[in-house]
Amino acid sequence: MPKMKTNRGAAKRFKVKKSGKIKRGAAYRSHILTKKSQKRKRNLRAPKYVDSTNIKAVRELLAI
């Protein structure tokens, strides 16, 4: 049986850390930023991790 292919879109959006957690980018941070407060934008820079309910699905997309 051939190897599973990695979903390339998912590979660009997620990064697996040494601890096994999967890091992701924050939503609401790409455009229409002028109306968002500095505090809100600063908090969006903080690292975000995939929730435990979604880890299995993301791991399948990443073929790991």
From Swiss-Prot:
PROSITE patterns: RIBOSOMAL_L35. One of its GO terms (cellular component) is cytosolic large ribosomal subunit. GO terms for molecular function: structural constituent of ribosome. Belongs to the bacterial ribosomal protein bL35 family. Keywords: Ribonucleoprotein, Ribosomal protein. Residues 1-21 are annotated as: Disordered. This is Large ribosomal subunit protein bL35. HAMAP family: Ribosomal_bL35. Disulfide bonds: none annotated. The keyword Ribonucleoprotein applies. Transmembrane segments: none annotated. Gene3D superfamilies: 4.10.410.60. The keyword GTP-binding does not apply. GO terms for biological process: translation. Residues 10-21 have a biased composition (Basic residues).
